[in-house]
Amino acid sequence: MKFFIDTADVKEIREAHELGVVDGVTTNPSLIAKSGRKFADVIKEISGIVDGPISAEVVSLEHDGMISEAEELVKIHPNIVIKLPMTPEGLKATKTLSAKGIKTNVTLIFTPMQALLAAKAGATYVSPFVGRLDDISQDGMGIIEEIRTIFDNYGYTAEIIVASIRNPIHVLNSALIGADVATIPFSVIMQLAKHPLTDAGIKKFLEDWEKVPK
């Protein structure tokens, strides 16, 4: 399973990339706004750090505007993936961009049928939001299982990006289900590396080393 980092914070991206576990990056307008920088500048800098798919989201709500934005974004770097909302206009734009050979990531997916529509429209990636579903007492990981089954049944090549990840258990379940990608906040990536027994073991080794004659 591939790990994308879900952030527009260049410092976090750089640090996670140095761990050797980051295969790509997902951003959205909210994450870009937190950076306080120009959209294009942030995307350009990220593209220079991670050699993998970089999802950059359009903000237009209608087809022609989405296409216009997408054509400008892909000029920034060959690794740019256009992030589109799961709406009828977003599906139209997905079809158009797919025909042009431009990679797409259909986002804000909350049902298996939305994922199926996106795959049929030619999406490169689909992004179901598990955490937001959990927040309203629905089974976020359950829809990942259903999407995986549907795509496998019919041979759809769209990759499943598990998004809105809130904790390490979401990552574990994504891997067990067979999702293609988990896009993970920096804080959760760091949690994945931690275990109290690891820390205790290191502490014990160092204490014992101090007893070794020098």
From Swiss-Prot:
Q: Where in the cell is it found?
A: Cytoplasm
Q: In which pathway does it act?
A: Carbohydrate degradation; pentose phosphate pathway; D-glyceraldehyde 3-phosphate and beta-D-fructose 6-phosphate from D-ribose 5-phosphate and D-xylulose 5-phosphate (non-oxidative stage): step 2/3
One cellular component term (GO) for this entry is: cytoplasm
- Into which EC class is this enzyme placed? transferase
Instruction: Please give the Pfam families that the UniProt record associates with this protein.
Output: TAL_FSA (PF00923)
| Superkingdom field | Bacteria
A Gene Ontology annotation in the biological process aspect, one of them, is: pentose-phosphate shunt
Entry-linked Gene3D superfamilies: Aldolase class I (3.20.20.70)
GO MF annotation list: aldehyde-lyase activity; transaldolase activity
Catalytic residues at K83 (schiff-base intermediate with substrate)
**Catalytic activity reported:** D-sedoheptulose 7-phosphate + D-glyceraldehyde 3-phosphate = D-erythrose 4-phosphate + beta-D-fructose 6-phosphate
Kindly state which keywords UniProt assigns to this record, in alphabetical order: Cytoplasm, Pentose shunt, Schiff base, Transferase
Q: EC number(s) in its UniProt entry?
A: 2.2.1.2
Summarize the protein's role: Transaldolase is important for the balance of metabolites in the pentose-phosphate pathway.
Family under the similarity heading: Belongs to the transaldolase family. Type 3B subfamily.
Protein's recorded name: Probable transaldolase
* Organism of origin: Geotalea daltonii (strain DSM 22248 / JCM 15807 / FRC-32)
Classification of source organism: Bacteria, Pseudomonadati, Thermodesulfobacteriota, Desulfuromonadia, Geobacterales
